[in-house]
Amino acid sequence: MSYLMMDLAGLTVSATETAQLQHPQVGGIILFSRNCENKNQLIELVKSVRSIRPELLIAVDHEGGRVQRFREGFSLIPAMGDILPAAKGDLTLAKQWAKECGFLMAVELLACDIDLSFAPVLDVNGISEVIGKRSFSAVPDEVSALAQQFIIGMNEAGMAAVGKHFPGHGSVAADSHIAMPVDPRTKEQVEAFDMQPFKHLIGSQQLQGVMPAHVVYSNIDPNPAGFSSYWLQTILRQQLGFDGVIFSDDLGMKGASFAGNYLGRAKAALDAGCDMILVCNDSVGVNALLTEFDWPAAEPTHTALSLKGNTAQASQALEQQTRWQAAQLLAMDITRIAQSL
């Protein structure tokens, strides 16, 4: 079954967490900065999780820039929004750089037996401060082109790609971590602008996963996208033809609170079409779901376990020391150039 992705409180797995991880509805864990003191400790933490449930999907938000959970012992990945400016607007060069950044990010996580980074961000940079330089560009075609190459780099390391935040978070000012963003634009406006990177990458079959936004598009549907069967089924599945895994964003965020407590949020997300739901930073919420929620009896139609890292491909990628080292230097150069602009 395995519909839930939970987190861990610290540097080791507690007795309570060990019991929770053994629950059949837990299909994955998401790691945060608090779980990583250094690379060796992180590897031991992952090993301990694997000893409990070897098949769990282990994920992290490791996009680059300000959203990079692991730093000690890891290369600092530049913000995606710095790549094109650092290339002085040369899209061909920026695409090459984006591919190497995707490879670098993925290969270093896979070296620690971490399956997945929730990346890339496909939001088009607009007025959202929480997105900002997490986005590749303010131009949809540039987002599509750079994200496509970033994904190729990820795939060459052995990692699947999860695009976020569908259908686009860049055109709302509010931060869904602490508020409920409302986007009043029409369906035609959203489709012509924000949705273009998703449409392009789904059309080229390069997205294995999608994470929807906790944003209400008030002139289109009353529910936030992550709780909307219109957005997830009618648009994402049927209109765009997406056949991968739909992850909810964190059900602990303010943008999810409209659905009530965690039981209500989980039901709303699953009913809308999410295949795996995330609950972060709330062990009480996780416990409530594992003990009180009426989970679906059937397996998810699109199982998140299909996104586990390709270990054989990762091993080959890890042998590419020259590429890895060149990518590390490139990442530093991009950040240095961007800071000088």
UniProtKB/Swiss-Prot annotation:
SUPFAM superfamilies xref list: (Trans)glycosidases
Gene Ontology CC annotations of this record: cytoplasm
Catalytic residues in the record: H177 (proton donor/acceptor), D249 (nucleophile)
Reactions it catalyzes: Hydrolysis of terminal non-reducing N-acetyl-D-hexosamine residues in N-acetyl-beta-D-hexosaminides
Sequence positions that bind substrate: D61, R69, R134, K164, H165
Signal peptide start and end residues: none
Places the protein is found: Cytoplasm
Annotated site, Important for catalytic activity, chain positions: D175
Name of one Pfam family that matches: Glyco_hydro_3
Plastid as UniProt keyword: no
GO biological process: carbohydrate metabolic process; cell division; cell wall organization; peptidoglycan biosynthetic process; peptidoglycan turnover; regulation of cell shape
Transmembrane segments: none
Its EC number(s): 3.2.1.52
Pathway terms, separated by semicolons: Cell wall biogenesis; peptidoglycan recycling
Protein keywords: Cell cycle, Cell division, Cell shape, Cell wall biogenesis/degradation, Cytoplasm, Glycosidase, Hydrolase, Peptidoglycan synthesis
GO molecular function: beta-N-acetylhexosaminidase activity
Enzyme type, top EC level: hydrolase
InterPro entries in UniProt: Beta_hexosaminidase_bac, Glyco_hydro_3_AS, Glyco_hydro_3_N, Glyco_hydro_3_N_sf, Glycoside_hydrolase_SF, NagZ_Beta-hexosaminidase
Sequence similarity: Belongs to the glycosyl hydrolase 3 family. NagZ subfamily.
Function: Plays a role in peptidoglycan recycling by cleaving the terminal beta-1,4-linked N-acetylglucosamine (GlcNAc) from peptide-linked peptidoglycan fragments, giving rise to free GlcNAc, anhydro-N-acetylmuramic acid and anhydro-N-acetylmuramic acid-linked peptides.
UniProt name for this protein: Beta-hexosaminidase
Organism: Shewanella frigidimarina (strain NCIMB 400)
